[in-house]
């Protein structure tokens, strides 16, 4: 089994007093990880909240009944916890009234789960995000040389665990993931009724990775007003399908100040959405795929490392651009991301170096990818 980065972090706080929440898209391995970690224990109680009777059980429950149900169990796992009404209050009932029991809750939507647990569980929880497999996890599973060789494959099929483990069946698995799981939680949100428009929106975003996104222009393309586009994008982001990268602006008048790019957390899902599994050698979007790959993997690494770095891209009105920036503790790191090795010596724009003279600048290609992802 592929070792997950979160395993050690979660293991270190098991049997503690605080609840644990693990949020991430469906099928990234949240339940698999917990089952593997807790398989040798007999004091674990599992609730799968995709099941109707489990949701009914929690609908109107008291601490007395919870104590009776939990009995001698010391860990209670609540899977897909966002589906339970007032789940934060239910977890608080357990943590406040049954102090010897630790709750571990998983959720596939921060839009729902975070809003339901943050206030009731203030100071009572440890929160983690879980992503599809990472470049670093796969390097640890095999080795650096092997995973670098696999990068073109990952850029097409992504890092979902079942996809990685289903060699030769990647398209079938991605089809099921994108059709059966991708929209399950999103379409259950209040007022998300235009499912066909949502699919068109996601397809439009898939074609624009690496490019600046205008809510007005996308709205005209898919037939939605700009406010609805922004709301749907917010929900897609909080369902761990996409993420936004904003433009960096500090010192120059001609820097773009309110722009954004949108990327996918997993390129297999991105390619499934538009039905394009062509190999990278024949693709016209290979540069955009590589940019998405590097930035998504860097953000995953930063999250697991506990980094507080803020992430941006930089661009001027004269179209001078840097693909990816990080700022932490007043220090800036700038990365230009190039698939073509012949562009490995691309210089940093002079206007940027003058405005931010102490920036650490680096061009990222396949040959030095470990310098940013390990």
Predicted regions and their residues:
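A short beta-strand-to-loop transition that corresponds to the Sensor-1 phosphate-sensing loop
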Residues: 106-110, 116, 132-133, 367
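Short glycine-rich substrate-engagement loop in P-loop NTPases that contacts/grips substrate
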Residues: 45-75
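Conserved P-loop NTPase "ATPase switch" module shared by AAA+ and STAND
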Residues: 70-87
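Interdomain hinge/linker elements that couple catalytic modules in large macromolecular machines
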Residues: 129-297, 303
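A cross-kingdom feature that marks ATP-driven nucleic-acid transaction machinery
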Residues: 3, 12-21, 25, 31, ...
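Conserved ATPase-coupling elements of RecA-like P-loop NTPase cores
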Residues: 57, 82-91, 115-116
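Short regulatory helix/loop adjacent to the ATP-binding pocket of P-loop NTPases
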Residues: 111-126, 142
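Conserved catalytic/switch belt of AAA+ P-loop NTPases
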Residues: 88-111, 118-120
């Amino acid at each position: 089994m592929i070792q997950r980065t979160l395993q050690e972090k979660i293991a270190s706080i098991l049997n503690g007093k605080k609840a644990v929440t693990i949020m991430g898209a469906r099928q990234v391995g949240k339940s698999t990880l917990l089952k593997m970690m807790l398989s040798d224990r007999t004091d674990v109680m599992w609730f799968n909240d995709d099941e109707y009777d489990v949701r009914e059980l929690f609908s109107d429950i008291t601490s007395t009944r919870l104590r009776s149900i939990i009995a001698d169990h010391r860990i209670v796992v609540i899977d897909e916890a966002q589906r339970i009404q007032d789940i934060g209050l239910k977890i608080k009932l357990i943590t406040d009234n049954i102090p010897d029991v630790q709750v571990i809750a998983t959720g596939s939507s921060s839009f729902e789960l975070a809003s339901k647990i943050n206030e009731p569980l203030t100071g009572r929880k440890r929160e983690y995000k879980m992503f599809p497999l990472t470049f670093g996890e796969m390097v640890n599973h095999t080795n650096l040389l092997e995973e670098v060789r696999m990068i073109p494959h990952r850029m097409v099929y992504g890092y979902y665990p079942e996809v990685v483990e289903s060699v030769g069946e990647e398209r079938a698995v991605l089809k099921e993931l994108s059709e059966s799981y991708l929209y399950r939680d999103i379409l259950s949100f209040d007022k998300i009724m235009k499912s066909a428009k949502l699919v068109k929106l996601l397809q439009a975003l898939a074609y624009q990775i690496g490019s600046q996104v205008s809510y007005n222009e996308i709205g005209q393309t898919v037939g939605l007003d700009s406010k609805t586009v922004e709301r749907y994008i917010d929900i897609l982001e909080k369902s761990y399908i996409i993420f936004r990268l904003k433009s960096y602006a500090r010192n120059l008048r001609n820097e773009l100040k309110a722009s954004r790019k949108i990327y996918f957390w997993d390129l297999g899902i991105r390619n499934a959405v538009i039905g394009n599994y062509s190999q990278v050698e024949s693709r016209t979007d290979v540069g955009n795929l590589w940019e998405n790959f590097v930035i998504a993997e860097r953000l995953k690494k930063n999250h697991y490392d506990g980094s507080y770095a803020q992430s941006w891209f930089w661009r001027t009105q004269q179209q001078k651009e840097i693909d990816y920036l990080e700022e932490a503790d007043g220090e800036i790191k700038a990365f230009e991301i190039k698939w073509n090795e012949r562009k490995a010596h691309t210089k940093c724009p002079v206007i940027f170096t003058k405005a931010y003279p102490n920036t650490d600048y680096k061009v990222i290609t396949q040959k030095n990818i470990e310098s940013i992802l390990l």
